[in-house]
């Protein structure tokens, strides 16, 4: 009983909110067998046909290529593209591609040679003999991307789900009106669908494998049931027809009952989904070594006399396929790539088929109906009821029109699957999906600009930091070079410090002058040099202190100890210098010229007399009658002070003026000197007499 209940539970089908039931319009092409499209005169292969960056070119203009030969290099999430047939590359230039913007992208133009000659192939009949890494690499190098419309690199998707997938879902719903590519593929290649599913099971090791298909495809259901005989691990689930049940989140909810959170993918709940066409491409890449160079494309619409499904090479122009289907242009032809709800109108019929092109719709004016003008939103709420993603289309519309990008992002704009259900039910004929696509593109552009700005800012800040480090290092080198002393400079400083210490020790000693010899000024000169050397040493210490980084972690007691040690070392060095230089004795003095010493002494005496005379003339001479009125003690003191000043002035004059030769000495008047000396003696005698008269014994 429990087993029956469990089996019944496995067959449960859930439903999702929203959705619509538009006319299916599938019988125009689903009852016609698939045809192989002929090669056009020129194939135009865009380099980017998937999500992610385009690959690096590995061919050049004028080069001959073989069928299946890679045209670009595939690294990481970059999927390579391949030559759809053998021929010559006539150009590598921009061309309009299958995109709503109608912008030109870089494409490889190949002129077929008609031979359709393959490159060397290496089929793997038994994939179970290969490890998973080799299988994933082969899928990647085959250029396989999601053929259901997203274009996500299949190998990257499988790599991310190797250890986290519990449920593998094969999407065979194909819910959009007019499109029957997967329907015819399952009818005619059901065995390849099953074999590709088994390869995925070998890679992912899922606990459950489900194939979801709508109940409006009875022929495909019968073909799959026949191919799945004996494959109990693969379960075929037939679901009700409802648009958009083929969406990844919607089909996950229908088959498992699990809802994918906002902003997440099905892989976040352990579910991995692959399209039927992608599964067949995986089988052909692994077993047959055929890269993705062709796919099934539905050509339908009342403007075609022979609608159906075609195996079309990647790069085939749309106009070439339309001609094969009997295209009859209207007055204002409209060709849509994709379905009527999720497709877009082509700006040019020279646009090539790419990996995600599943349908080309060529309707007549009557079929599409008259285009009604867009009107104001009446806030009816029908779009909210129809949205299968649980969004608020009305609010997203206002945010998109008002360019309120952050509000649109916060209202989960990127969870919109662009199914068109909201626009289908809108009574105001508002093209809501177009607004959402434009808003998404603007947000992506702003994000890219912000990312580039952040990268530029990071580079600028890194450059500024590097320049600052280089500046600090350069200044430090300059400071170190400025304070670096050579050996000679160090010796000079030490010698000057030693002389200064020697002079300090001999401050009480007098300078001896030997008669007939010039005075020894070496001590004065040495002191002056020592002071200069000491000043230079202080400057050096200041520079060294400035060059070293400041720190507050130095102990003041340690600093005091270091200073004391430095003073002791300096005193020892000065004493050693003093002991190393012998002091000259007085016996060495007679080596100087005695005549020069005599001349210097005579000049000193003459200058002293002149100074005394000048002092006498500057003060008025008092008469003898006035003398008794003065205080003799003050006069004696004044005379003594005058003599001292005269002696100091004479000594200063002697030091400041150069020593004159013998020939210059007789030029002074000896009589004036004698008069001055006599006057000085008279004043002294008067002062003495006055002092004795005032103070008798």
Swiss-Prot record:
Q: Region entry Disordered: which residue ranges? A: 576-674
Q: Which residues bind [4Fe-4S] cluster 2?
A: 387, 416, 419, 422
Disulphides: none
Cofactor comment: Binds 2 [4Fe-4S] clusters per subunit.
- The answer, when asked if Transmembrane helix is one of the entry's keywords, is no
The Gene Ontology CC terms held by the record are: plasma membrane
**Hey, which family's this protein in?**
Belongs to the 4Fe4S bacterial-type ferredoxin family. RnfC subfamily.
Protein name per its UniProtKB record: Ion-translocating oxidoreductase complex subunit C
The scientific name of the source species is Yersinia enterocolitica serotype O:8 / biotype 1B (strain NCTC 13174 / 8081)
Q: Which gene encodes it?
A: rnfC
